[in-house]
Amino acid sequence: MAQDASLSSFQESEWEVILPVLYRDRAVQNVEEERIRKLKTRLQQLRWRGAKRGGQEYAEKSCARCRRALGLLLNRGAVCQGCSHRVCSECRVFPGRTRVWRCTVCYEGRNVRIKTGEWFFEERAKKFPTEGRQETAGARLLQSYQELSKISVVPPTPPPLSESWCSSSPGRLQELSQPRGFNKSVENLFLSVTTHMKKLSKSQNDVTSDKQLLSTSPEQGTGRPERRSQSDTAINVTARKISAPDILQSLSPESPKRPANPVLKQENLLSHPTPGPLFSGGSRQGSLISINSACTEIGNFDNADVTGEVELALRYCFKTRSLEVCIKSCRNLAYGEERKKKCNPYVKTYLLPDRSSQGKRKTGVQKNTVDPTFQETLKYQVEPAQLATRRLQVSVWHLGTLARRVFLGEVIIPLASWDFGDSTTQAFRWHPLRAKAEKHEDSSSPNHGELTVRAKLVLPAGTSKLQEAQEGTGEEPSCDGQLCLVVLGAQNLPVRSDGTLNSFVKGCLTLPDKQKLRLKSPVLKKQACPQWKHSFVFNGVSPAQLRQSSLELTVWDQAAFGVSDRLLGEARLGSREDPAGGAGSGSHSKLQWQKVLSSPNLWTDMTLVLH
Amino acid sequence: MASATDSRYGQKESSDQNFDYMFKILIIGNSSVGKTSFLFRYADDSFTPAFVSTVGIDFKVKTIYRNDKRIKLQIWDTAGQERYRTITTAYYRGAMGFILMYDITNEESFNAVQDWSTQIKTYSWDNAQVLLVGNKCDMEDERVVSSERGRQLADHLGFEFFEASAKDNINVKQTFERLVDVICEKMSESLDTADPAVTGAKQGPQLTDQQAPPHQDCAC
Ligand SMILES: Nc1nc2c(ncn2[C@@H]2O[C@H](COP(=O)(O)OP(=O)(O)OP(=O)(O)O)[C@@H](O)[C@H]2O)c(=O)[nH]1
Ligand SMILES: [Mg+2]
Ligand SMILES: [Zn+2]
Ligand SMILES: [Zn+2]
């Protein structure tokens, strides 16, 4: 077959460019499937509301949707032309400007067919009846590819054994054995590709040089890296979108260019109170920036000598639970390109420790100025309790030609001590810009992601007097305290080469008498940013005991068939000093932990850095 | 006695899907006609004169606001080079609409349009919406394919036609928006035929009051 030859002639270097695209696509698909699942669930719920309930007689004269009784003369109801059910006047929807109506279920059914793309799959099935709806071309390519090439292609860092085991789990096998309309020969082609590649990687020396040629590092002067819409590193970023923590729901920055009816827009924000799509932001406002900023996070950017200041104000709106960062202007910035005296500055913010693209906000880019005025407000939806654990990173960048970025300076504002109630702190202030501060922190203790947890010490009424508990001398006040810990989720975990994890969390509370209480969360499959939302409850512990206890939380990637699970990272809370932990983060979580113990019956949110 | 229990923690799910629906669009055409440039112009408003031929496939996601709906577009940029054909054609089946591109300064790319169209017919669904785009209309001096020929071919194939320039940002946005609109139209049709009660009584995402784009052909 002619195609066979073309495919098997692909070089490893080419696959290195294609695979990240497939992974990114899969992340997009995952989000999409989740959305569709929700839409369908909602429709189902709507149907159930009208369904005949157990024991209740199906009165002929009642609305098929809300079960309200219908009268003989007044409020008789009318028959829906979609489903022929009689419904009351409340349960009709008039779509658009027409007088034709549908009952709520029919209307929603139609909506769901639009929103899920079902209409397309139905149409397509007329031509390709065997085509499944979910599996995209990319998913299939990826599947075949992974199935066959793991050993030779995937870099050896993640345990290749466990991966190949996982992928040959029964579910996967079944999927593979039913290629559902997928051109069988293409799968075979992949087989030949991979065998070919194995040979390549063993014998051919020029593979490495090819690699360089195709390398996705934007530092290479060639156009290619910039042209790729996402670098390799962006895979995780993308995947992260699948399950962003609820506690940090972003409001997409205002985009004045969007021709949105403000009312409608508001409505949409309310019904989907969540971040704007990652790659787009919904409008032109610098998706170029978002696309490459994954690179800037890992150090692929130029540095200018840092000068100047940024003027900003911080407000927290308790009503909407949003942090507003008003970026007014900068002055006296360094030139992004010193020789050409060029500077196109923009400002980017993160609420550290969240460095995911979810938590990124940017202003527009100003052209040719070192004293730009932005007047833009960047918003973060964040719970007040979360604020104390965050630091606002405000960095200024120059956007050069070919999307090259130059770092112009940053300021980091810890929010723990920020008084959002005080109006004087809400005024605009100038903050001097500094050089990148965090490099050393990141390199000295490798960050293995962050774990967000929420903890509460539950004490029965009467024993919550702190002094009593704190002393712990003589008679123990009570032993029936309870430590509740909700493991919300994790992000920035070291994912497998396919961009996902089958992760779970273990909690181990070591009491002063060395007794260990162990708990484990369920495994969340195939997610890069798992949201377990699982709670660990340690019963019968007193505050005094807890003060001398330590709680160790470890995140694992599950391996199938007895191959040992991979430890992704750990965080420790409690009395024992963590010898390995970085000083900064260690002391911070220590403070948080003390807060949990000293404020019984109150939830404390913590973001723990995994080591 | 100290003990430990696990329990599920119910919390409201975060929905991070701030859009109404998702369309998948494929850009095809010979190598170097400007597919990647066209997409970058649209998604990032950027253009670079350097030519980096696409390896395999790539995509971008952009959410637009159209007809009171947020539509998430997943736009696939395919490699024009023959060697990637197996991969790129695998994506035809998932696409609701196509942008078939040629270069007005390159006769060969225009002659290939018929073949590309056949590929669509072979690999895609029957109602695939296709826009024919003659790119690089900023290079009037080097033009070898007249607007007229472009339009005639489009008529012949049953596609809509635009001349555009990724470089000068001419008709780029219009092309995508028109494609979105025609997909929406197809969608309404498909839904209405499935629901006989509304045939004739248009509803939902109707675009009848959508006026034609300002200038379909290049003004330069
Ligand atoms: N003058 C002019 N040049 C353009 C235009 N669009 C693209 N180009 C140039 O044409 C060359 C090819 O553009 P690409 O977008 O990479 O071509 P492609 O169709 O993606 O090519 P493949 O990836 O190989 O399929 C580049 O040098 C672009 O700068 C345009 O509208 N006007
Ligand atoms: Mg290209
Ligand atoms: Zn009713
Ligand atoms: Zn009905």
From Swiss-Prot, chain B:
A GO term from the CC aspect: perinuclear region of cytoplasm
Residues binding GTP: 31-37, 48-49, 53-54, 80, 135-136, 138, 166-167
Activity regulation text: Regulated by guanine nucleotide exchange factors (GEFs) including RAB3IL1 and MADD which promote the exchange of bound GDP for free GTP. Regulated by GTPase activating proteins (GAPs) including RAB3GAP1 and TBC1D10B which increase the GTP hydrolysis activity. Inhibited by GDP dissociation inhibitors (GDIs) which prevent Rab-GDP dissociation. Interacts with MADD (via uDENN domain); the GTP-bound form is preferred for interaction.
Topology term for the membrane: Lipid-anchor
Record flagged with keyword GTP-binding: yes
Keywords associated with the record: Cell membrane, Cell projection, Cytoplasm, Cytoplasmic vesicle, Exocytosis, GTP-binding, Hydrolase, Lipoprotein, Lysosome, Membrane, Methylation, Nucleotide-binding, Phosphoprotein, Prenylation, Protein transport, Synapse, Transport
EC code: 3.6.5.2
Residues binding Mg(2+), per UniProt: T36, T54, D77
Effect of T36N: No significant effect on interaction with RAB3IP
Region (Disordered), start-end ranges: 194-220
S-geranylgeranyl cysteine lipid attachment residues: C218, C220
Subcellular location: Cytoplasm, Cytosol; Lysosome; Cytoplasmic vesicle, Secretory vesicle; Cell projection, Axon
Catalytic reaction list: GTP + H2O = GDP + phosphate + H(+)
Pfam families from the UniProt entry: Ras (PF00071)
Cofactor: Mg(2+)
Motif (Switch 2): 80-96
Domain of life: Eukaryota
Description of its domains: Switch 1, switch 2 and the interswitch regions are characteristic of Rab GTPases and mediate the interactions with Rab downstream effectors. The switch regions undergo conformational changes upon nucleotide binding which drives interaction with specific sets of effector proteins, with most effectors only binding to GTP-bound Rab.
PANTHER family in UniProt: LD44762P
UniProt family annotation: Belongs to the small GTPase superfamily. Rab family.
Function, in words: The small GTPases Rab are key regulators of intracellular membrane trafficking, from the formation of transport vesicles to their fusion with membranes. Rabs cycle between an inactive GDP-bound form and an active GTP-bound form that is able to recruit to membranes different sets of downstream effectors directly responsible for vesicle formation, movement, tethering and fusion. RAB3A plays a central role in regulated exocytosis and secretion. Controls the recruitment, tethering and docking of secretory vesicles to the plasma membrane.
Name used for this protein in its record: Ras-related protein Rab-3A
